[in-house]
């Protein structure tokens, strides 16, 4: 026998996988290899993509899984950070998924073959391959990867987190502003003051200047550390106590500032019952102040833990555009004679505009101080 040569074959992982795995680790997402390959082969691939880093990761074979009860497997998964499942059959995949679910995990399973269909169905999120996957696996899955790329899963996780964050930002902005309006009206009644905001002006705020920034917050880009936070508890509500307290105290602050400034202008112009000029000045000032405060509040709402200076004011051009349009609308309402007659507003001097802008910025300063001193405490 004459030795001619030795040939080896290798199916390397895609180039984007190591970076995607690193992102999942930072995001607190556990990744397991479940394969029919030989254990050391699976370990070598896992090391190559960064799924394991310890010297001796736990390798569980299909034969071992046969001897494990679901409870024991759940404990093994809990007590071992790095596990590789090798030489497994489709039935074993179902057992692994059940054990992970028993530990309270939300399980996403990838697969491309007919034999992966039961596991894809059992998982919370079944992910099939769009190119290499079979029709059966695609029908059994919840999501199909059009490019068969693991990196796309990570992108989907990031997009999901962005959507959830933006929903909270929208709720926070809307609730804090509406509470501010309620406090303004309620406080004025309790203090025996005339109405600072007429029904028409409230509608102008809620249906005019308030709407565009709220919509723009829905297309906010993700925060810098969005993929460095652990997954949230699936049972966690959007309106948790700290979140409610946060927008409630800001709403009270908004109401207090607007009511206080309304009272200040009434006194400044020596308001008495029937003094229409003094009332119009005070009401217009309160309205414009409320609009400007809400614009600052929209800037604050972009992040509950990061300074607006760190995020950058112009990274969301939609929001900046919405704020400019809202301010322009408010300016027209106060300064155009035709609209003054309809809305019950009056002209403000340059000094009054500057004073209002300065007063409105207090909410921005307050939130910047909170973020610096109590980062994320009320998020």
Question: Predicted segment positions?
Answer:
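Residue-level signature of catalytic and energy-coupling elements of molecular machines
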Residues: 1, 24, 37, 42, ...
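Cytosolic catalytic headpieces and adjacent flexible linkers of membrane translocases
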Residues: 1-99, 103, 117, 123, ...
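Flexible loop/turn segments at secondary-structure boundaries
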Residues: 13, 39-41, 92-94, 116-117, ...
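Amphipathic alpha-helical transducer elements in NTP-driven molecular machines
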Residues: 14-18, 39, 70, 93-94, ...
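Charge-patterned, long linear interaction tracts outside catalytic cores
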Residues: 98-117, 125, 200, 213
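Mg2+-dependent phosphoryl-transfer enzymes with acidic/Ser/Thr/Gly-rich catalytic loops
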Residues: 115-178, 219, 223-227
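C-terminal transmembrane helices and immediately adjacent loops/tails
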Residues: 156-379
């Amino acid at each position: 026998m004459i030795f001619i040569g030795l040939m080896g074959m290798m199916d390397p992982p895609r180039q984007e996988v190591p970076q995607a795995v690193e992102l999942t680790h930072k995001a607190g997402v556990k990744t397991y290899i479940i394969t029919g390959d030989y254990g050391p082969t699976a370990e070598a691939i896992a090391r190559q993509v960064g799924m394991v880093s310890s010297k001796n990761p736990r390798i569980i074979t299909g034969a071992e899984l046969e001897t494990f009860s679901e409870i024991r497997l759940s404990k093994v998964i809990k007590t071992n950070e790095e596990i590789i499942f090798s030489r497994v059959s489709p039935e074993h995949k179902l057992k692994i998924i059940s054990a992970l679910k028993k530990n309270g995990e939300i399980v996403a399973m990838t697969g491309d073959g007919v034999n992966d269909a039961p596991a894809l169905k059992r998982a919370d999120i079944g992910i099939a391959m769009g190119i290499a996957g079979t029709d059966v696996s695609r029908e059994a899955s919840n999501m199909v990867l059009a490019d068969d790329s693991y990196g796309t899963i990570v992108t989907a996780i990031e997009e999901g987190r962005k959507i959830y964050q933006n929903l909270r930002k929208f709720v926070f902005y809307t609730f804090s502003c509406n509470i501010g309006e309620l406090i303004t009206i309620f406080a004025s009644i309790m203090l025996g003051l005339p109405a600072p905001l007429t029904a028409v002006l409230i509608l102008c705020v809620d249906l005019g200047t308030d709407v565009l920034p709220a919509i723009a917050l829905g297309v906010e880009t993700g925060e810098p550390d969005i993929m460095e936070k652990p997954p949230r508890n699936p049972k966690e509500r959007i309106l948790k106590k700290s979140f409610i307290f946060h927008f409630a105290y800001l709403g009270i602050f908004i109401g207090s500032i607007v009511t206080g400034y309304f009272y200040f202008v009434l006194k400044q112009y020596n308001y008495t019952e029937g003094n229409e000029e003094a009332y119009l000045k005070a009401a217009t000032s309160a309205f414009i102040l409320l609009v400007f405060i809400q614009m600052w509040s929209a800037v604050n709402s972009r992040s509950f833990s990061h300074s607006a200076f760190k995020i950058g004011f112009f990274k969301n051009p939609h929001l900046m555009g919405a704020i400019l349009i809202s301010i322009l609308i408010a300016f027209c309402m106060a300064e155009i004679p035709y609209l003054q007659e309809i809305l019950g507003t009056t002209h403000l001097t340059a000094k009054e505009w500057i004073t209002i802008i300065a007063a409105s910025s207090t909410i921005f300063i307050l939130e910047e101080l909170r973020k610096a001193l109590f980062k994320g405490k009320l998020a």
